[in-house]
């Protein structure tokens, strides 16, 4: 019998997701600047909404690029 491997969320439950934490937010963005989907990141639905909201806010404030300038 094969059991599905349970993925652990990269963010602990209840941990605040802040738009100023650029290093954390970069983990959820591709090289081209697109937000990674929930099935790849392993986040819960609530965490995914918070992360995408924080990424969008950081982009508007200039903390994250809309498109990666490297390459």
Swiss-Prot record:
One of its GO terms (biological process) is translation. One of its GO terms (molecular function) is structural constituent of ribosome. It holds the Pfam family Ribosomal_S18. The keyword RNA-binding applies. Gene3D superfamilies: Ribosomal protein S18. Binds as a heterodimer with protein bS6 to the central domain of the 16S rRNA, where it helps stabilize the platform of the 30S subunit. Belongs to the bacterial ribosomal protein bS18 family. HAMAP family: Ribosomal_bS18. Part of the 30S ribosomal subunit. Forms a tight heterodimer with protein bS6. This is Small ribosomal subunit protein bS18. The gene is rpsR.
